[in-house]
Amino acid sequence: MCGIMGAVSERDISKVLLEGLRRLEYRGYDSAGIAVIDSQDRLKRVRIQGKVQNLADAMQETAIAGNTGIAHTRWATHGKPSEQNAHPHLSHGEIALVHNGIIENHEHLRQQLITYGYQFTSETDTEVAAHLIHYHYQQHENLLLAVQKSAAEMQGAFALGVIHQKRPEELVAIRKGSPLVLGFGIGENFIASDALALRSFAQSVIYMEEGDSACVTTQDIKVYDSNRILVQRATHPLNSDSEIVNKGPYRHFMLKEIFEQSKVITDTLESRINSIDVLRASFGEKASHIFPMVKNIHIVACGTSYHAGMIAKYWLESLAGLPTQVEIASEYRYRDVVVPDNTLFITVSQSGETADTLAALFKAKQSNYLASLAICNVATSTLVREADCVFLTRAGIEIGVASTKAFTTQLAAFLMLAAALCKDNRAQEVLRQLQELPACCERVLQMNEEVESLASLFVNKVHALFLGRGVQYPVALEGALKLKEISYIHAEAYPAGELKHGPLALVDKDMPVIAVAPNDELLDKLKSNLHEVSARGGQLFVFVDDSQNWKANGARLIKVPSCGAWLAPIIYTIPLQLLAYHVAVAKGTDVDQPRNLAKSVTVE
């Protein structure tokens, strides 16, 4: 969500901080700001509502410069998007603070600080943290201790970066439930909410652990655990500038990432399957011991990853015969869950830092589960560190807020898992089809121009309805989510068999209805449902297997290359991604950074 960047350097750091924010734009934000301590130890701040480029323009006007500084992109939680609510927040013109997360007891702390004489100028919970740290600094004149004491009083999940004009040589950071990275450079050191921001600036990084705090100077980074004891944390080399993502020849990151799916699926499968087996070591060292004991499965995730889990339910129950329950993480956290014996708990997350998914995993670790498995795209994430078993997808960095390649690699991972847990020779057919998957993706991507031609038919629509049956119902859900995320068209998805139980009332000549219709055992049932749409004058678009002879009957048929039955949910997802993309482009929306959304949702 919010992006944090901070540095202490022997040079002017303002342009580095700005570039760090540009690399964090993909996370989603509505305002941005920077604060530095200048050569005369004065605290200078610039904040704007809007894009990082607006901040760059404002910085040029004010000629802001300094060797120590913090910067931030804000995604509004407490307080509307505005310059007044943008970070960094100040206290008494001495302390500047950036914050990612939520301080749950901010109202109580606010009232307490008001009694101490503090005045508030914003609606945010962040300003509470700034004043609280100032209060403790007045008592101890030690910035690190002031931050540690303040964090102990604050409830919630957050990460902070703090500077003080009387301590121009240091930057203090703390992590409590929200990710933060420390970076080592030459004559300069950094903090950031994402290692991507530090590429080409830092040579190596430390991923702060839960409860860690750090004091960062030009010469050193000292890390303290939750007990305020100095500790040594593992350092990890950081990839060079050559690996920083760019759009290449594509107009948007989302389109680039859609077209990368064949490659990243190839990477995800590589060295993990052969013609007769899935290498269980792909799921971690413990998998060979755990998998034979699995009798039930619970899958917990959010958003697109939840849809991946829903598809996986069909595969796991059909192939492995394992009862599988799929839960939305934010709901799972707050109910009493019955855990049958020998249940495998699976979490799915692109970032591995999704707050609700992590909280669900922590809850599961206190329950009677056999073990936990994380399917994740980020090897250094909290989810990966906390799970018993891990399958790392190899989707690479995904910049577009609307997930594409991360989703299809999650599906590839789940299909491999179903094959690994399958106890009969159907697993070999699944593996054969998986080996064909990258080529199938390439064929589907050749539909791009045909799908683009549909966009003009959706531009002026207000609503859309997606339909699927069986395992294609979650595919329809994902298609509807993509369309609403980036085109802002209200879209719903239903099992086609539920049409007559309510959704049919919405169907008329102005309602586009999109159906997913592979050649499977439910095809005839689906055709019957679609006749109901046609009879009501609905504007029908059907993605059909190109081996089938369909009678259009007024519907627009979009032929999808034939593929193996187990691959159909993956293959039929791709044209729906393309449809959402081209409709959004035709409408002129911000495809890569849609309004109100964040890439990594690190708060509840």
From Swiss-Prot:
Q: Into which EC class is this enzyme placed?
A: transferase
Q: Gene3D superfamilies given for it?
A: Glucose-6-phosphate isomerase like protein, domain 1 (3.40.50.10490), Glutamine Phosphoribosylpyrophosphate, subunit 1, domain 1 (3.60.20.10)
Name its GO BP terms in alphabetical order: carbohydrate metabolic process; fructose 6-phosphate metabolic process; protein N-linked glycosylation; UDP-N-acetylglucosamine metabolic process
Q: Name one GO molecular function term.
A: carbohydrate derivative binding
Which parts of the chain span the membrane according to its record? none
Please list the residue ranges annotated as the SIS domain.
279-427, 454-594
Main location (coarse class): cytoplasm
Q: Which residues form the active site?
A: 2, 599
Keywords, comma-separated and alphabetical? Aminotransferase, Cytoplasm, Glutamine amidotransferase, Repeat, Transferase
Matching entries from InterPro entries are given as: GATase_2_dom, GFAT, GFAT_N, GlmS/AgaS_SIS, GlmS/FrlB_SIS, Ntn_hydrolases_N, SIS_dom, SIS_dom_sf
Q: Which residues form the Glutamine amidotransferase type-2 domain?
A: 2-219
This entry's Enzyme Commission designation comes to 2.6.1.16
Pfam families, per the entry: GATase_6, SIS
Q: Where in the cell is it found?
A: Cytoplasm
Q: Check the record and name the CDD domains matching this protein.
A: GFAT, SIS_GlmS_GlmD_1, SIS_GlmS_GlmD_2
NCBIfam families membership: glmS, PRK00331.1
The record's note on quaternary structure and interaction partners says: Homodimer.
Q: What function does the entry list?
A: Catalyzes the first step in hexosamine metabolism, converting fructose-6P into glucosamine-6P using glutamine as a nitrogen source.
Report the protein name in the record: Glutamine--fructose-6-phosphate aminotransferase [isomerizing]
